Structures are given as structure tokens and as C-alpha cells.
Amino acid sequence: MSRINLLLLCGGGSAEHDISLMSANYFESSLAKSDQFSVLRVELDKLGQYRTAAGDDCELTNNREIRFRDETKAPWPVDYVIPCIHGYPGETGDIQSYFNLIQLPYFGCESEASSNCFNKITAKMWFSALGIPNTPYIFLHQYDDEAISQAQTALANWGSIFIKAASQGSSVGCYKVDDSSKVAQVLKDAFGYAPYVVVEKTIKARELEVAVYEYNGEIVATLPGEIICDTNTFYTFDEKYAKSSKARTDVVAKDVSVELSEQIRAYAIKAFKGMKLRHLSRIDFFLTAENEILLNEINTFPGSTPISMFPKMLQNHGHDFTEYLSLVINSQLSAKD
């Protein structure tokens, strides 16, 4: 049986570029455990240049092959691609549109689902339309006096707010604000990351995460895990990835009743189905002291770094990551044939 030529594409043009490389390491080591795949790792740098791990400049062509700048190297035909890219152009849905155009099968959510989840405003509209509770919010489309006034009113009404760039991941462009004198500058900073900004009510709650993925034709939702941060912080980019981070994770959250856990999992599956997600996702919730469940966000290509929750929760659920990848890829390629 011939091997599947699998392109592991990583990097991208966002602030999460280096995190994507870390996740790609996990995918690469997992794929290496199977003899089904011939893997070519290619990094997409921040300027849009493709480069192999060996340092060869190359490009992905419309003929579904990697063509090298060094013309003495034969083109490498691509059967399948894993776009291990956090942020732009992976989770935004942009690169999936290109794969669709050239009819190249790929791992993960499709273009529209990726785009809808990455934009926090669009995502919250979908959550509400699906009847899934989420945090109170307003959204702003430009930085001006009216936007500042609206954000200050939200702060006065809610006591504390988060101002977030609508189209960023890993808490990039995300700020907690308790002082009205800081609203204008923070709002300006957030608009520096995205053309739209969402202002959310600060929720004092536990942060729970569910891995939701497809396995043997079934949609699986794991037991909720938990992110536990220092009481004076929220889960910032640095808290997620810095070596000095004080945050810790529990693969299975403690002291969550069976009833609450099942309701969270039901909401997660409802969101996965309703938003037409595919293959994998990490769906994040708040659980308040009053046991109110609020959907926070959906990550359509969750991190797979040494500290990431998705692979840990999948494995804790009894599934092997290499076998999971093989099942998804083979099922997809068989359906294509």
C-alpha cells in the first residue's frame, strides 16, 4: 500500500506563528508513529513564503504539488494537508478557501465555519441563534467618540468589562478594563488589531473547556477540563505560553456535578453541529458560582503544544491521537474516491 503524501503546513502570518510551530511538532511526532504517511513539513512565514524544514524555498501550486525553487528537485505531489496554523490564515478560513479551490482535501473545519468562529461578533450571534447562553456584549465598528461613550456606558452598567479585538486568537488584543479613564486608550489598542471590537461583561467564573471531535463517524465531547489562573489575572497570551505562567490545567475539572457536566457537553455538541464544525474543536465555557453556563468561544484549530488541553482531553477520553488522525484522514480520502 502506497503512503499518503501529507503536507504539514504550519506558521502563518499572525501573532500565534510560533505557537503554530509548537503545535506542528506534536502533529509531526504523532504522524511519525504511523507508517501510512509520508510527511513534508512546510512553514509559511509571516511574509507568505513557503519553506521546508530543510530550508528549501517552495510553493504550493494549483496542481496540488509542492514545487521547489531549486528546479533540480522534483515536485512533491500532495494528497492531503493539515493546516496547523493558529490565527491568520488558518483559523480565519482563508487558506481553506484556497484548498477548496484547488480541490485539495484538508484536516479541520471548513472555510465558513472557521471564519464564523474566529470572528467573536459573528460567533456570538450564532450562539444566540442556536439558543446557547453566552456573555452579554456590545460590538463596535469604528474608533470614535461614540464608541468610547458606548464602552464607558457598558463599564458603568457592568462594573467591569473586557475589550477584545473581534478577529484575534490566544487573547491577543484582549484587555480587562475596570477604570473608565482607560477605556479610550484600550479601545484604540484593540482597534489596532482588528476592524471590529467586542465589549463583553466580565464574568467571574470558572473557565472550562471541552474537546469536541469526530471519531469513527461519531461526534465526541469530552468531560470538561479547567484552566485555573492566578486570581488577579485572566488567561492572557503570556499566561498560556510563558514559562513563568502560574496558570495550571486540570484535564477533568473538579467539583462539577454530573448534571452540569452533561449540560456543558450537550451545549458543546449543539454548537459543533449547529456551526457545521468538522474533525476537531475546543469549545470554552464559563461556569459561574450560581451554576450558570455561558459559552465563551470556539477554537477551530486548538493548540497542540505540551501544555495544550485538546490532545490531553482526547487521550484522557481513551483515544490515541495518532489513531484519531489516521481515522479522520483515511475516512475523508475514502469518501473522496
UniProtKB/Swiss-Prot annotation:
Record: residues binding Mg(2+) 1: D284, E297
Annotated metabolic or biological route of this protein: Cell wall biogenesis; peptidoglycan biosynthesis
Gene3D superfamilies according to UniProt: 3.40.50.20, ATP-grasp fold, A domain, ATP-grasp fold, B domain
Cofactor entry: Mg(2+); Mn(2+)
GO biological process: one example: regulation of cell shape
Disulfide bonds: none
GO CC term, one of those recorded: cytosol
Name of this protein: D-alanine--D-alanine ligase
Organism per entry: Shewanella putrefaciens (strain CN-32 / ATCC BAA-453)
